[in-house]
Design a protein with these regions (language model features):
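Helix-to-loop junction immediately C-terminal to a conserved catalytic motif
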Residues: 83
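ABC ATPase NBD Q-loop/coupling interface
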Residues: 92-109
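Conserved ABC ATPase "signature" region
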Residues: 146-164
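Conserved ABC ATPase signature
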Residues: 169-173, 177
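Conserved catalytic motifs of ABC-family nucleotide-binding domains
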Residues: 190
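Catalytic Walker B motif of ABC-type/P-loop ATPase nucleotide-binding domains
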Residues: 194-197
Length: 322
């Protein structure tokens, strides 16, 4: 990954300048920047655990970024820092270049700007109707009822919540429907950054597809910066622009999807793997077949192979005519 040195802000010490020079996935104007973050559970106790160890990372504005790593790698701890749900022991979290803890009394405003959907958010539903649950956040923002309705309808459309269940109790819904309602409740607040921890955990393939398609469409149509934590490299490949790989409380690598998946050997070394179809396409390329890079789905691979075979067929027919 390209690492470039940036000019230190006025008054920043040499150590901070060195830290910003080692930021992974670096961009000039990141939406979120982590600078040398360390987070310790049970600090100064016999049970001390270093969940994050000197993490520096940029999250690009408007992108859909996936964070992947094994249990205990630090990914869930990291996303709770983005909106100040927890506070690092060392380092800074910057949102649009501003330290989110510069004015601690204003941290509540940060949480409106960075929406966080925890794992299994359906357990947080509590209102009498689906509509009221999705509308809860916007109403707390003191919006007019007309704007609340507009936001509820928009969020419901993105997450696949049908109109005919709006007056039902959320507790009468299936698990997948509850999940979509819970995610819609955060989307309806229109945060600048939407962070989701394993949004499709426990869902069947159809439910996973519905959730991720809605999130991808939300990102494309609104320009909202979206961050997804997932254990599935298939999901990373299919839906994400950028990928962050975590291992042993550190960011192992970060960059575009193509950049990260090109380092298949390093991923396998930490027990992760690229999608099977991508691995097959890479083997075909190594064998001399003109397979394009960046094929992560069966449909895309099939289309590319058909095109290659058709081109070879046309070439053979051309030789026969001559």
């Amino acid at each position: 990954m390209k690492k470039t040195k940036t000019n230190s802000p006025k008054g920043q010490n040499e150590q901070s300048a060195h830290e910003s020079a080692s930021i992974l996935n670096q961009t000039e104007n990141p939406k979120i920047r982590l600078e040398n973050i360390t987070f310790i559970y049970g600090k100064n106790s016999p049970f001390e655990v270093r969940a994050l160890d000197g993490v520096s990372l940029d999250i690009h504005a408007g992108k859909l970024t996936g964070i992947i790593g094994h249990t205990g790698s630090g990914k869930s701890t990291m996303i709770q820092l983005f909106n100040g749900l927890t506070r690092a022991d060392e380092g800074r979290v910057l949102l649009d270049g501003q330290n989110i803890w510069e004015h601690p009394k204003d941290i509540g405003k940060i949480r409106y700007r960075v929406g966080l959907v925890m794992q299994y958010p359906e357990y947080q539903l509590f209102e009498e109707t689906v509509y009221a649950d999705i509308a809860y956040g916007p109403r707390n923002m003191k919006l007019s009822e007309g704007e609340v309705r507009e936001r509820v309808e928009e969020a419901a459309a993105f997450t696949g919540v049908p109109d005919d269940i709006m007056d039902k109790s959320p507790f009468d819904l299936s698990g997948g429907q509850k999940r979509r309602v819970a995610i819609a409740g955060i989307m309806a607040m229109r945060p600048e950054v939407l962070v989701l921890d394993e949004p499709a955990a426990g869902l069947d393939p159809g439910g996973r597809h519905t959730i991720f398609q809605g999130i991808r469409e939300y990102n494309r149509r609104t320009g909202c910066t979206v961050i997804i934590v997932s254990h599935s490299m298939e999901d990373m490949a299919r839906y994400c622009d950028d990928v962050v790989v975590m291992a042993h409380s550190k960011v192992l690598m970060a960059g575009s999807r193509d950049q990260v998946f090109a380092r298949a050997d390093e991923l396998e070394a930490v027990g992760l793997d690229i999608p099977q179809v991508t691995k097959l396409m890479l083997l075909l390329r190594e064998g001399g077949m003109p397979v394009p890079a960046g094929l992560y789905t069966t449909a895309a691979a099939e289309e590319a192979l058909v095109e290659i075979f058709e081109a070879a067929k046309r070439e053979r027919e051309g030789r026969r005519i001559k």
